């Protein structure tokens, strides 16, 4: 529940910031009449992401067992790529995202008689990017942790992001966004490492990867996945009490370079904004 909550909170807050920045800029530049058009783009993006998620989830439920495992592995790999890209993309562009959005709005509203649709499409693509990232992560998360709690966590994360977005727009709160994105990014890298290890496990169960399947270590006597804390670790970080050598290797092969790249100072002009 916690991982879907945090990821969707972060993704939802990014989308809320985009919408808030666009709405604030339209109001500040005496173009508030276009805010309704902006919301059309938001709703279209939300409908696309929701429809795609439902379609993929319903379609894959009919797959045979091995094809299901293969699909789970592919979705996990896509989720790892998306989460990693999300972390480093936000780290790179967060300082200039406000200027970039304002320039995109100006460009959309200068395209002749059809600039309303240009604004709709600009907002649609900006919000849909965040939503599609969430869709593939949730597909991977729901496959690893079945039950009602992951969807509930995702809905709570989305609701929290919406509330925070409105409060930011109205000026009711100020968040240290730099710290928020920094610590959630670090957490996400560990989540992605667990997904990468889970992808190798899924590929093995699908019959595509049969190398290095010896048990690396057995922690069942110390931290069983049947215990409360073990279950939480499994749901959050993909913990396995008796992982294979290939799972452990993939975990380290992904995480160590990712952490090194993360702790290195960002290039000039790519530091995160402090607050909003």
From Swiss-Prot:
Induction per the UniProt record: Expressed in response to iron deprivation at pH 7.
Pfam families named in the record: FTR1 (PF03239)
Keywords: Cell inner membrane, Cell membrane, Ion transport, Iron, Iron transport, Membrane, Transmembrane, Transmembrane helix, Transport
One term under GO cellular component: high-affinity iron permease complex
Record InterPro entries: EfeU/FTR1-like, FTR1/Fip1/EfeU, MFS_trans_sf
Transmembrane segments: 2-22, 35-55, 70-90, 119-139, 148-168, 180-200, 245-265
Topology versus the membrane: Multi-pass membrane protein
Periplasmic side stretches: 1, 56-69, 140-147, 201-244
GO MF annotation: an example: ferrous iron transmembrane transporter activity
Compartments, as annotated in UniProt: Cell inner membrane
Cytoplasmic side: 23-34, 91-118, 169-179, 266-276
Biological function: Uptake of Fe(2+) ions across the membrane.
Subunit-level organization: Part of a ferrous iron transporter composed of EfeU, EfeO and EfeB.
Family: Belongs to the oxidase-dependent Fe transporter (OFeT) (TC 9.A.10.1) family.
UniProt name for this protein: Ferrous iron permease EfeU
């Amino acid at each position: 529940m916690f991982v879907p909550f945090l990821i969707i909170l972060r993704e939802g807050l990014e989308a809320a910031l985009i919408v808030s920045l666009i709405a604030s800029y339209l109001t500040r530049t005496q173009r508030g009449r276009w805010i309704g058009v902006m919301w059309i783009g938001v709703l279209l993006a939300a409908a696309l992401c929701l429809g795609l998620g439902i379609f993929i989830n319903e379609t894959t439920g009919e797959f045979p067992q091995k094809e299901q495992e293969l699909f789970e592995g592919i979705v996990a790999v896509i989720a790892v790529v998306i989460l990693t890209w999300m972390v480093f993309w936000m780290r790179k562009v967060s300082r200039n995202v406000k200027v970039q959005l304002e320039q995109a709005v100006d460009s959309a509203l200068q395209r002749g008689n059809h600039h309303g649709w240009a604004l709709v499409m600009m907002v649609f693509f900006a919000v849909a990017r965040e939503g599609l990232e969430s869709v593939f992560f949730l597909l991977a998360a729901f496959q690893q942790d079945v039950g009602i709690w992951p969807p509930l966590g995702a809905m709570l994360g989305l609701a929290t992001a919406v509330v925070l977005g409105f409060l930011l727009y109205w000026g009711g709160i100020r968040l240290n966004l730099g710290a928020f994105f920094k610590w959630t990014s670090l957490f996400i890298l560990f989540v992605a490492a667990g997904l990468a290890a889970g992808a190798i496990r899924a590929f093995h169960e699908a019959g595509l990867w049969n190398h290095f399947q010896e048990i690396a270590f057995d922690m069942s006597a110390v931290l069983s996945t049947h215990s409360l804390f073990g279950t939480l670790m499994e749901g959050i970080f993909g913990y396995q009490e008796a992982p294979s050598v290939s799972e452990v290797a993939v975990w380290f092969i992904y995480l160590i370079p990712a952490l090194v790249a993360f702790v290195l100072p960002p290039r000039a002009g790519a530091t995160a904004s402090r607050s909003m």
